[in-house]
Amino acid sequence: MELEKFKDANKDELSMIEVAHEILHQRGETMAFADLTNEIQVYLGKSDEEIRDRLAQFYTDLNIDGSFISLGDNVWGLRSWYPYDSIDEALVHGEDEEDEERPRKKRKKVNAFLADVSDDDDVIDYDDDDPEDEDLDNDYDDEDDDDDEGSHELKQYTKDLDDIDDGDDPEDELADGIEGQLTEFSDADLDEENQD
């Protein structure tokens, strides 16, 4: 296939997106992505490996470039062929034809706030009082009894502390070696030093 626009151009300098645009423009009809890629490969004379390496970037460029449009099923065309208002209609019309061939399933409407009789496990009934709430009310009376036991334990502990002898044990005193080296200062001694 010869492209008139690129007669004098060096094929090595052409991008795949430019060639794709010209192929679609010259043919005047939509093409599948695989067929379009094969046409580009033949025109540019590139190997399968070279095309495979550039394929992801080419597909990205097709999507990003505003002059191409995907018509579904990986079929591509030029956006200029479709008036702006008819683009949505053409796409929606294609979906409508498929819908006519197979009947649609009717979906059951679900209201999340209404309880379904068969699914009582999933529904939370906020009107019923929980048995745990009743248990809490009854436990307040029992806590008063616990306070009496706690105060008894406190009294026993205090008594045990009083029984401990606070007297000085001979073992607690240090040998005269360390205590003898310590000096006690009285306020009078400190006042004398400040006057000097």
Swiss-Prot record:
MF term (GO), any: DNA-directed RNA polymerase activity
Matches recorded under InterPro entries: Asxl_HARE-HTH (IPR007759), RNAP_delta_N_dom_sf (IPR038087), RpoE (IPR029757)
Pfam families: HARE-HTH
Segments of skewed composition (Acidic residues): 119-150, 162-176, 186-196
TM stretches of this protein: none
Superkingdom to which the source organism belongs: Bacteria
Signal peptide positions (record): none
Domain HTH HARE-type, residue spans: 14-81
UniProt biased composition (Basic and acidic residues): 151-161
Keyword Nucleotidyltransferase: yes
GO biological process, one term: regulation of DNA-templated transcription
Region (Disordered): 119-196
Keywords: DNA-directed RNA polymerase, Nucleotidyltransferase, Transcription, Transferase
One GO term describing the cellular component: DNA-directed RNA polymerase complex
The keyword Nucleotide-binding is annotated on this UniProt entry: no
The protein's assembly and partners: RNAP is composed of a core of 2 alpha, a beta and a beta' subunits. The core is associated with a delta subunit and one of several sigma factors.
Family: Belongs to the RpoE family.
Function according to Swiss-Prot or TrEMBL: Participates in both the initiation and recycling phases of transcription. In the presence of the delta subunit, RNAP displays an increased specificity of transcription, a decreased affinity for nucleic acids, and an increased efficiency of RNA synthesis because of enhanced recycling.
HAMAP family per the UniProt record, alphabetical: RNApol_bact_RpoE
Protein name: Probable DNA-directed RNA polymerase subunit delta
